[in-house]
């Protein structure tokens, strides 16, 4: 019915907190069993959530943190450039709250990632990952419904990343 209740907020909070606790335990267990660096990854969609999660992940023992900043905005009134500014704002906030290296994974939905990559480095990121692999839907024509697309990567998935890595390699510090 479109109504959002306090009960729904509680359930969402409880579910997220439980999943985060599982993830933090996984980091702790991995650190206890491995001698190689552990790079944790988080994907949030609100600016405020990143810093809380990042600090907890650092405290769990992660050696570095990947920020998977991927969302698709289809709003007509979304201001041009706001998506890129969100990346910078998230990096600034996270860098204030952790001392471990921070890496940013970008989505493919950028017109020109090179200026953003330069700005991310200027704000102290240790690296950039090109690109996030998007979940692809498909359509079941017999049932006329959406279904999950291919979940596995293919060699052709690399071409766009390789192109942008080549273009950025001599333009990014």
What are these regions (language model features)?
Residues 8-16:
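Acidic/glycine-enriched edge-of-secondary-structure segments
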Residues 1-6, 18-28, 32-39, 43-173:
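Alpha/beta enzyme core
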């Amino acid at each position: 019915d479109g109504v959002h209740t306090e009960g729904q907020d509680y359930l969402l909070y409880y579910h997220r907190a439980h999943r985060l606790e599982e993830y933090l335990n996984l980091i702790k267990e991995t650190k206890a069993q491995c001698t190689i660096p552990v790079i944790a990854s988080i994907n949030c969609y609100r600016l405020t959530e990143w810093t809380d999660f990042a600090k907890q992940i650092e405290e769990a023992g992660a050696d570095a943190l990947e920020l998977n900043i991927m969302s698709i905005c289809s709003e007509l009134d979304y201001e041009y450039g706001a998506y890129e500014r969100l990346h910078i704002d998230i990096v600034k906030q996270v860098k204030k709250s952790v001392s471990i290296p921070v890496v940013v994974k970008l989505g493919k939905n950028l017109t020109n990632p090179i200026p953003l990559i330069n700005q991310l480095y200027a704000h102290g990121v240790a690296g950039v990952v090109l690109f996030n692999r998007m979940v692809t839907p498909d359509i079941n024509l017999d049932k006329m419904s959406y279904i999950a697309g291919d979940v596995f990567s293919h060699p052709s998935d690399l071409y766009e990343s390789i192109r942008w890595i080549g273009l950025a390699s001599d333009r990014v510090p």
